[in-house]
């Protein structure tokens, strides 16, 4: 999540999340969307302060097939330069629009007062116009390679899937996902008022 962003390139984790849903090596964005829809499933990737989350909703009878798509999204991202530029520009425009929101402005000011400007937690997950202008596609690939690791992953299942079925489906992760050490920095403490 945000905690692993370079302080000068805040928004990288968010762009990685968005890029993961922009197709795979074997599927264009439209083909991926259609494959998910054909299963009656929903897959989304979002960034929080301390995580990149892959959320999946599917019928239990489509669990294995849906997870195959999740694996494809996670292990075979497309990294299309045109999609990257489109998403980056979209995000910059969204940031510009958000400046007119009193709630958004208040939230940003509050975060800066609490954490201080040099603390990553005072930054918006989406980044800023300035930070996004510094981010290149290679920065996203670097974040992806060095920040997403099974050691820091957790899987939660709710629904009509047996433990044995879940273990069978997730077994492939052991061979596909390289376990790397990811050092999650401790954020600086928030400022306190006396």
Language-model features: locations:
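M16 family metallopeptidases and their MPP-like homologs
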Residues: 1-18, 27-75, 92-93, 104-130, ...
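Acidic/histidine-enriched alpha-helical segments
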Residues: 33-37, 78-96, 162, 181-194
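A common structural junction motif
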Residues: 72-81, 173-181
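An aromatic/glycine/proline-enriched structural segment found at the starts
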Residues: 117, 121, 125, 150, ...
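Short, charged, amphipathic alpha-helices and their helix-cap/turn boundaries
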Residues: 132-136
